[in-house]
């Protein structure tokens, strides 16, 4: 007699699997009827598996960050070292926030995971979406870590077809179904290779949507790229004219009395930095050091892992903001699956004394091509959604006597034009902000009504750009849904 679910239990939350149907895995999610029937349907339509299109599959590794000088370098002389964040569901690689390795590492330690044009790159490890796929563009030379694989297909159009296919939500659900592991899910090679592939799907709808999305993103970028120019112009700050970068142009001299007792860092005294600093004083508005506006200042804390047992009367679980959450374009990126929740001691939370309009400064981190010192602001919306703390790599300031949002936009521009680059030191591959110099930097201070005018204008530009990006994202999502529905209806 078949088992019947008791009436007091919602039947839509319960499903029954016969013992004979168990496939060696005991996670309930694997046997959920909706995903099981979806996979059965996809397999019934497919005649091939991913392995049938792969000439070779290889994974990489991550060279030790403790030996930065041995393995890594800058973008000018280095080879792109791809990570999961460089993969996109539109099938294209993003080289923003890219790390670079030297040629010896590329041709030695990581020779087996070299990436060439038209190779298919697929995510196999990590939280969030599984099997994100991107195609290496024409002329590309790169490498990758262990969290994705390089699949050589030998054919450009085939790689693009497979990327479109793997980036469909219904196929991602199948890939995620076969991943294992709790805190860091992984898709092993046998499971990856056995992903069913349906041939001859018409992806023209997605191609058209991608083109429209790209056009909207380009318009958004134009708007965002003009923000720094607008802010500098309205403050009367004229950027120094760029000169050629010959060796002779980069050589400069400094009087000994200027460096006596100070730090021997050529960046601090370089002609470009000196000219940038001088340009601030050309503004007709008042100037004050940042420290004049700071009324509270506090370092962060990393706390304890959320899996640890703690006395909940003495600790609070918080979303701990790290440098990873700093968005180079907007503010903080907290709506992803990579955020960290940790236990923070209540006494330390009290010292942090977090309020809306507090500014967070990245004091340690950065990369070869990205100075440390990025800035973010805690808005009412952020504080309403989560109990917030911040890591020991972040420093918080509370200001008065100046519009906090204006100060946020101003400091963001100062970072973008590389003034912050002169306020840091570097040890073991990690950049550290020299806080005393950062707090002593010059702030151009127009009257409060002018500050608000600047804030309103920049906020409106960012809003327009965000709307364009969201429109592009929606167009692509709808196209994918149409293609997926055509597959399901077969």
Predicted feature residues:
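Flexible, active-site-proximal loop/turn residues at the rims of small-molecule/cofactor binding pockets
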Residues: 88, 127, 201, 366, ...
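Short glycine-centered helix-capping/turn motifs at secondary-structure transition points
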Residues: 170-173, 262, 283, 415-418
